[in-house]
């Protein structure tokens, strides 16, 4: 879902990108921007994303544990198991928690994640949106009516702890300033903003 353009701008290269309903396109220099806008027209919306520094030793484990322990007793936090995986697939708000995996077996072999349930209902989760050697890109989503309750913070803290316990780096890339704020709350630091094009082809 994410394409990164580098080198000399090339329109044929842009046109060769496999089209999906939604994808993100970024580039290493602004010379690409006019070509991206010309190639995709109104389907390409110019936005800012925020790169977060990769600092393996900055996390305060005791602080993160205290966040997890602050979760209200009305909620249950658990590992991303088969039941949670199937629940995540069923709703639009949560599908990205598992969309990069063929099935639960694939998820179990390559990923790790955490979820918060309320009365048996999945209400928040943190899971890999991308996987690379010794690291993941964190995806956090919360059911709309359960937002602003601190659930995303708890999920993020728990997944970071799980990653550290398994020698996996929990990488973070923020799509907006709210995501930056959450990242900073968990111990990360902002590096810089960068231009991205959100391209929708489903409309």
At which residue positions do the language-model features occur?
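Acyl-donor-binding surface of acyltransferase catalytic domains
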Residues: 1-87, 197
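Conserved acyl-CoA
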Residues: 16-17, 154-169, 189
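Conserved acetyl-CoA-binding loop-helix of GNAT-fold acetyltransferases
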Residues: 138, 148-162, 181, 185
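A short, internal acetyl-CoA/4′-phosphopantetheine-binding micro-motif in the GNAT/acyltransferase core
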Residues: 4-12, 139-148
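Terminal substrate-recognition subdomain of acyl/acetyltransferases
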Residues: 53-54, 185-203
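Conserved active-site alpha-helix within GNAT-family acetyltransferase domains
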Residues: 34-41, 175-193
